[in-house]
Amino acid sequence: MTKQEAYSSSLYLGVCAALLSLLFTNQNHIIGFSLLSTFGGYLFLRKQSAKSYLPAMAGAVALLIWKFSMIHILLVGISSLLCVMYQLPYGVSLRNNGILKPISIAFAWTLNTVLLASADQFEFIPNDHSVIFSTLSVFTLTFILALYYDLKDSAEEEHKNSFAVKIGIRYSFRVAIISMVTLILFGIFYFDGITKETVALSGATVYMLFIHSKILNGKGSTYIIDSCFIVYALIFLAFKHLIQ
């Protein structure tokens, strides 16, 4: 990945994170933090120069100190720890553990979007803004996209021991579709009907068919995979406005 590709794709991921946060909060500082921390974090993970990611990270830290509560800081601390553990030397890095790699990525994204946005209004009962189901949705979606990332990069040495590459594209696709369909059915039962959450997940599941076909043809790209977040978020927002 070239310097320009790393910069633009990291920025795109930052926009994806901000859009996901927008689904769960209208607080600009939380949305801005998700954008800056994801953008800077991915530049760091992609081993870009400090001058490329430090401005974004500095902006994120400034927002954290100025606007966030202790529960927010705790969540950010956990997410930052995962980021550091992901980048540790070979043998102890989360990046090099076949199954922990997609789990850690999914957990970090969930912390940095839905849980960070919902930290001050967490409820354990089904309601219009269900943190529990949204947490499951973002975690599952990110976990599956992490598998697709490894399949896209399967020719590279660092991805050859990944969970997705070991089980192959066919079984990875089955894991993806079965997981998404199970979550959608659970959501219909959980909310006692079709909601914006389940409709958005359905749209993301259909989009995964497109990702799968592109990877099979050797044309998968970071933008094609990451756009699944955009599809999910836009359908969520559109359906939300339709039912209001």
Spans of model-derived segments:
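N-terminal membrane topogenic signal
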Residues: M1-S10, A50-K51
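Small-residue-rich segments of transmembrane alpha-helices in multi-pass membrane proteins
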Residues: Y12-L19, L54-L64, P102-A117, V165-R174, ...
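Helix-coil boundary and interhelical linker segments in multi-pass alpha-helical membrane proteins
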Residues: C16-F33, V61-L75, T113-L136, F186-T195, ...
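Hydrophobic core segments of alpha-helical transmembrane domains in multi-pass membrane proteins
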Residues: I30-F39, H72-V84, S134-T140, K196-V206
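Solvent-exposed interhelical
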Residues: S34-A58, F139-T182
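Intramembrane alpha-helical segments
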Residues: Y42, A50-D120, M208-H212, L216
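Functional transmembrane core segments of multi-pass inner-membrane proteins
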Residues: P102-S154
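Extended hydrophobic alpha-helices typical of membrane-associated regions
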Residues: T198-Q244
